[in-house]
Amino acid sequence: DELVAHLVLADAAIREEMVLKIAILAEKYATDLRWYVDTILKLISISGDHVSDAIWHRVVQIVTNHPQGDLQAYTAATLLVAASPRRCHETAVRVAAYVLGEFGFLVAERPGMSGEEQFRILHQHWVTCAPQTRAILVSTYAKLANLYEECRPLVAPVFARCKNSVNVEIQQRSAEYSAMREAFSPEAVEDLLREMPPFEDKKQSALEQRLREKEGDDSAAVAKAARPSAAQRQRAAQSAAATRAAEEVAAQQAAEQNVLNDPSLSSMKWTTAALY
């Protein structure tokens, strides 16, 4: 919590790395995964622009892989509340869209959390969202329409408009989900839109891998900055050559001056002239 509080005052140049390290520490030392979810949501609210996809993907993976207890229901309810304000960071919308599409049914019986309410809360962000987020929302809408009868008349016009979207991913998803209901039986559609299976649990989390990659990128950047460029090396070589040429000219001029100033050499010149 102290690190999260310090993040507000941290320099923008180090925030991304700080967010990544806080996320790793929160996962590593979490005694309660609900606290871990809350910590990541704090990171999103404080410094959402610096929360990478790897961080929120990891939240989704952990929540999906822990069906026991109330973690999935807790996360769905918490994210629905987090996405309720109209001004909400887009990363929070992405996480909420995915989690509600998978586990929103666990809280649909609670006051203010029905399937229709879930759709309305998510869809208020549609206009301000990037295409990547809209693609996630389209998949969530398909799942909500499959689970809740009251969502179908709300989702249908959205999909109809999306079929003409300039974004290929949004256009394709909406067209496929619309055609799915017409081409398959309700049982087949339900089977196709059921919640995702658990993710493969790798020994090294994607967050730790991302941190190592970032540290490697930073080291490479420092080394590159310290190493002179080809143009700099060429200029240095030209400067050295010019310096050597100037030194040679100066040495030659000094030698000639010494000859003129040497008395013995001057008398030799007069003697030689007398012989002729």
Regions found by a protein language model. Give the residues of each.
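HEAT/HEAT-like alpha-solenoid repeats
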Residues: 1-12, 23, 27, 38-49, ...
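Short sequence/structural elements of tandem HEAT/ARM alpha-solenoid repeats
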Residues: 1-3, 16-17, 31-40, 53-54, ...
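Catalytic cores of large soluble enzymes that bind and process phosphate-bearing ligands
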Residues: 10, 32, 71, 166, ...
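Residue-level detector of extended alpha-helical repeat arrays and alpha-solenoid scaffolds
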Residues: 15, 22, 33, 52-53, ...
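Contiguous, well-ordered alpha-helical segments that form the cores/surfaces of helical PPI scaffolds
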Residues: 20-24, 95-102, 138-146
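A glycine-rich, aromatic-flanked flexible loop/lid motif
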Residues: 48-51, 67-72, 86-95, 106-114, ...
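Acidic, serine/threonine-rich low-complexity intrinsically disordered linkers/hinges in large eukaryotic
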Residues: 106-136, 140-276
